[in-house]
Amino acid sequence: MKGFDVAGSQRISDEATLRTFPKVELHRHLEGTFELTTLHNMAMRNGLDLPKDMAEFKKAVQFPKDSEPDFLKFLSKFRVDWYRTLDDIYDIAYASVLDMANDGIFYIELRFSPEHFALQNDFDRKVITKLVVRAANEAAAEAGIYVRFLITFNRMKQTPKEMIELYEDVKSLKQDEIVGVDLAGDETNYP
């Protein structure tokens, strides 16, 4: 029957109501979870060559919904030059977790690549890892939610040797919130 779910209750079509439902997020990449206004503010603050107008900015940084699927074009939107300071990285991690909490997510497994955040400025990968974990944990505590982490290795930007070194570095941090690793990037050209 149209408008009803299997149990016979009326379907909920109100987005605000859906946001209140408790949710679990098991596969969220920090690098792709930024709220557009936060990203725009950071781009303008850091003098990136991107449109100041929000509508044009959105076109420049988001994958168009009506486009043909193109994995490499999609990956090209994940720029490494957004982050000029450690504060930028802290702010993004903190704001992203609060945004997820506002969507009703109470448990998150957040993936992030220390390499992605470190590449532009050659930040120390262990410092990045500790910073992201701290920022996300502080936001999670504020929002009353849980967050765990997976460290992402990027097959396009890291050699196997670099991945193993990063793994050993992260393991040496002894942060129990880091529960796994992930392999991401262009699977076709970098199997």
Regions found by a protein language model. Name each.
Residues 2-191:
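Metal-cofactor-binding active-site regions of metalloenzymes
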